[in-house]
């Protein structure tokens, strides 16, 4: 009694076909299929690109010196006065 029989599912399917129509259901099915295919392709491509980047060593980080850190065009916010 608690579960649905095959007849319940057939009636639900018939009502859905009557409401949406077969053409609309076909379009929704093909859109869903292409979305799933695109997702799978994206996951496959993501795994290959991640494996390719793991093989290369990272470039060494550059060291910042005082000459680079103090730029003449920067403005100290606290020293600036409102006009």
Curated annotation (Swiss-Prot):
Q: Which GO terms describe its biological process?
A: protein transport by the Tat complex
Residue spans with biased composition (Polar residues)? 63-72
What's the protein's topology in the membrane? Single-pass membrane protein
Q: Where in the cell is it found?
A: Cell inner membrane
Residues that span the membrane, as ranges? 1-21
Q: What is its main location?
A: membrane
Q: Kinase as a keyword?
A: no
Provide this UniProt record's keywords sorted from A to Z. Cell inner membrane, Cell membrane, Membrane, Protein transport, Translocation, Transmembrane, Transmembrane helix, Transport
Q: Where is this region: Disordered?
A: 44-83
* GO cellular component terms, A-Z: TAT protein transport complex
Described by its record, this protein's role is as follows: Part of the twin-arginine translocation (Tat) system that transports large folded proteins containing a characteristic twin-arginine motif in their signal peptide across membranes. TatA could form the protein-conducting channel of the Tat system.
Cited InterPro entries: TatA/B/E (IPR003369), TatA/E (IPR006312)
Any one GO molecular function term: protein transmembrane transporter activity
Protein name per its UniProtKB record: Sec-independent protein translocase protein TatA
Family membership = Belongs to the TatA/E family.
What subunit structure does UniProt give?
A: The Tat system comprises two distinct complexes: a TatABC complex, containing multiple copies of TatA, TatB and TatC subunits, and a separate TatA complex, containing only TatA subunits. Substrates initially bind to the TatABC complex, which probably triggers association of the separate TatA complex to form the active translocon.
Where are the compositionally biased (Basic and acidic residues) regions?
73-83
